[in-house]
């Protein structure tokens, strides 16, 4: 679920894939559909996979299950496309539907640039000579604006520092040295698809996904790093992802929660809970705008389960 929320946060649309040979919905179906509604994914297609392993009667029964399950969601009137991924059956129809039913939004390139970091890495091979080393790379999707080669960028919350036992996070300033998108070098990058940004950062900072969850923008334009958040909370009636539907109780003070904000994942402790408002102290800070939505998960049994979302006040 953490992976799904992080990736879906930067998407313009989604494919909701179900298997024709099992009953719909499964626990994961409910969880993913609620998550999609929560983060505002409106452009959806339903893909009915594995039609090659069921007969016509079962395929039609599964179609009716899907129609019933999607009532009241953004997928209620979405096309349901039967496919066999293994045999590549109807893939041309699916590609056509993606092009026709998930429109590319009009982008305003004049607004402050934002990129959510999904990956970060060191591209230098072991044994590379010092003079041949290149800076660290951050990868992700540009949410708004555009980035150009030569831009001075800021990365928040940045890296963890420990000065005299006091732990803090320090934002990073870097310069864009290279941009790659669509498998080739580009001079500027805009929203749509994934982009790799080569920087002059020490590669030890970016290696092994060290900057995943950060936000990149032009220096001086990013929102404040938040160590505590006050949230307007909207809880689901039932927790999702469990085999048995479990009623969601109100959030309590001193309760641990896991929060997803864009591609950032952090844990926190509720320091105050009242009515539909919760104040949470975060173990790792996030960089997010007021009004941003944050997914909330609670430990139920042995797993963290999605229970609702909050809007940053």
Task: For each feature predicted by the language model, list its residue ranges.
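C-terminal effector modules of nucleic-acid-centric enzymes and ribosome-associated factors
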Residues: 53-58, 202-313
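G-domain G4 guanine-recognition motif of GTPases
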Residues: 19-21, 42-61, 80-91, 213, ...
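Alpha-helical scaffold elements adjacent to nucleotide-binding pockets in ATP/GTP-utilizing enzyme cores
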Residues: 3, 31-35, 61-69, 93-101
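Short hydrophobic alpha-helical segments of the AMP-binding
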Residues: 8, 36, 70, 270
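Short acidic, glycine/serine/threonine-rich loops at helix termini
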Residues: 27-30, 55-60, 92-96, 128-130, ...
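Conserved Switch II/interswitch segment of TRAFAC-class P-loop GTPases
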Residues: 1-2, 9-32, 37-60
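Short, ordered loop/turn segments at secondary-structure junctions
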Residues: 19-23, 49-53, 85, 158-160, ...
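Conserved catalytic-core segments of large NTP-driven translation/proteostasis enzymes
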Residues: 68-211, 215-222, 227-229
